[in-house]
Amino acid sequence: MRANVLKRKLTLRIKRKKRIRAKISGCENFPRISVFKSNRTLYIQAIDDVKAVTLAAVDGRKLGVKANKEGAKKIAAEFAKTLKAKKIEQAVFDRNGYVYHGVIAVLAESLRENGIRL
């Protein structure tokens, strides 16, 4: 039964993800910031959907941080530095089907604190 529950949760997250992606997209000056959360770490990237190119990315494994709130703050600070170096000040936040709570909310708030308008 446990496998069915996990499969259902993943199916529901993917449905939410598709609903969100149908409504938002990014461009070169206003990219989409996509977040992926695994059990161990976080991945965040800025995507230009018009050209289908990743403009900037930060991997939590390379920073040596975990997928918790403190790690989210560190990843957001590093990602904000990367975006500012590329002269990107505003973006669209794509939570990728995850609930805007906990780590995802801290990540978005930390990006805002570091000067990125979402």
Curated annotation (Swiss-Prot):
This is Large ribosomal subunit protein uL18. Disulfide bonds: none annotated. One of its GO terms (cellular component) is cytosolic large ribosomal subunit. InterPro entries: Ribosomal_uL18_bac-type, Ribosomal_uL18_bac/euk. Part of the 50S ribosomal subunit; part of the 5S rRNA/L5/L18/L25 subcomplex. Contacts the 5S and 23S rRNAs. This is one of the proteins that bind and probably mediate the attachment of the 5S RNA into the large ribosomal subunit, where it forms part of the central protuberance. One of its GO terms (molecular function) is 5S rRNA binding. The keyword RNA-binding applies. Keywords: Ribonucleoprotein, Ribosomal protein, RNA-binding, rRNA-binding. CDD domains: Ribosomal_L18_L5e. The keyword Glycosyltransferase does not apply. Belongs to the universal ribosomal protein uL18 family. PANTHER family: 39S RIBOSOMAL PROTEIN L18, MITOCHONDRIAL, LARGE RIBOSOMAL SUBUNIT PROTEIN UL18M. GO terms for biological process: translation.
